[in-house]
Amino acid sequence: MTDILLGIDFGTGGCKVTVIDSLGNILAAASGEYPSAHPYPGWSEQAPADWWRVMNTVLAELRQRPEWPGWRVAALAMDSYTHGAVLLDEHLQVIRPTIIWTDQRSAPECQALDPKTRDDIFRIGYQMPTPTWTLP
């Protein structure tokens, strides 16, 4: 049985999964894409269900490899693109698509902030208010 590290990366446009051995050798890799919706100019959203679906499809593809039965997942590393709030209801069900970092709909609000408010936001969150970043 070969111990492996399974790395799962959720990027802006897709999910990549890499299988690495204890020496750092890449044994296998697979990826799949998911869509972004742009219902209005400047908007950019994704359905969390698409992330889950694509990840499972990519993992299923890797499990079809003939060497898979000889691998034991010893560690799992996961990462994602910057940030995105997944809003849930009281039953932990997703209630709307996730607004992703490329969304620019809040540009007018960011531009309308007075200098003191902008400075306060920076002092508290160490970032300037821009449409790209969620406030802390």
Predicted regions and their residues:
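N-terminal phosphate-binding loop and adjacent alpha-helix
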Residues: 31-71
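Glycine-rich phosphate-binding/catalytic subdomain of phosphoryl-transfer
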Residues: 57-136
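A generic N-terminal leader/anchor concept
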Residues: 16-19, 53-56, 78
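Short glycine-rich, Thr/Ser-proximal phosphate-binding strand/loop in the N-terminal lobe
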Residues: 5, 10-48, 93-101
